[in-house]
A protein has these predicted regions:
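Charge-rich, well-structured scaffold segments of protease-associated domains
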Residues: 1-89, 112, 121, 126, ...
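Self-splicing inteins and homing endonuclease
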Residues: 97-98
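Flexible, small-/acidic-enriched active-site or ligand-binding loops
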Residues: 101-104
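A short catalytic or substrate-binding loop motif that flags glycine-/basic-rich loops and adjacent residues
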Residues: 108-109
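Long, positively charged, glycine-interspersed low-complexity recognition regions
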Residues: 115-117
Length: 267
């Protein structure tokens, strides 16, 4: 299972990017671990991990739909077994803001060269992390919108295709803004993006595009409340992140172009 991803170019380039950005943070390690680390697992270690992390006091139950709270609680009390109250604390190694290396190149027999450009940003938590995530998402959407000079210029010159996209990858003590896709000349794409980011940091983002993107994101978020599964996911993700379920709606409605420009300059 660990080795089967070694010939997946998307998987390889993703972790190559993380390993180029992070010195110590475990996010750079393949989620399945390594062959060496798996070999060290014993039955005792496995049971210890199970009883420590798969613990009711370390879990959140999220229920959405046509149900009654009292009935759900009664059923949970009947089926769930009492366990030791264990308070867990995740301790991450100190991570410098400097990157490990500016470029990683891996050769593989694929039809088109793939690239990921990752910006290592300052991590945050709670509401601050939510605000940063929303601002970063909007800023990248404005910069790379299909009508933006950056996107149109790269598309016209054949530097990108329909696979070009952006992503915010963040979690406990890490935050990365990513731009990715396929290109015959990834270095030219990198220089175009660098120039566009520098110009936006100096002169500001397109305000009309920002407002349109913000309103579009707001509308999409509101529509999710019609989906029962999406509501359940929202509640559990909010609980795990230390925020309230409606904080995203409130935060998104209050963001301004000045907030986005400030994030772009500082991050």
């Amino acid at each position: 299972e660990i080795q089967m991803c070694n010939d997946d170019p998307g998987w390889r380039i993703f972790f190559n990017t993380l390993q180029g950005l992070f010195h110590h943070h475990p996010v750079k390690i393949d989620i399945a671990g390594t062959i060496e680390s798996i070999a060290q697992i014993t039955p005792e270690l496995l049971y210890r991990c199970y009883h420590t992390f798969y613990n009711l006091h370390n879990m959140v139950l999220s229920v959405a739909g046509n149900c009654k709270v009292d009935e759900v609680v009664a059923l949970a009390d009947k089926l769930l077994k009492p366990c030791e109250d264990m308070q867990l604390e995740c301790i991450f190694p100190e991570e410098p803001m400097e990157i490990v290396r500016a470029e990683t190149v891996e050769t593989a027999p694929i039809g088109t060269t793939m690239f990921v450009l990752g910006y290592k940003c300052k991590p945050a938590s709670g509401l601050e992390n939510l605000k940063k995530e929303l601002l970063a998402t909007l800023a990248l959407k404005v910069l790379t919108h299909v009508t933006s000079p950056l996107y149109q210029g790269m598309l016209k010159d054949g530097l990108i295709n329909e696979t070009f996209s952006t992503e915010i990858f963040n979690g406990d003590d890490f935050f990365v803004a990513m731009l990715e896709g396929e290109s015959k000349d990834p270095h030219a794409v990198r220089e175009r993006i660098f120039a566009a980011v520098e110009d936006a940091a100096k002169n500001g983002l397109d305000e009309t595009l920002f407002e349109n993107s913000r309103k579009n994101a707001y509308g999409s978020l509101i529509m999710k409340f019609n989906n029962v599964e999406a509501v359940a996911n929202l509640m559990i993700n909010s609980a795990m992140s230390g925020i309230a379920p409606f904080d995203t709606v409130t935060m998104l409605s209050s963001l301004t172009i000045e907030d986005a420009n400030r994030w772009l300059r500082e991050e």
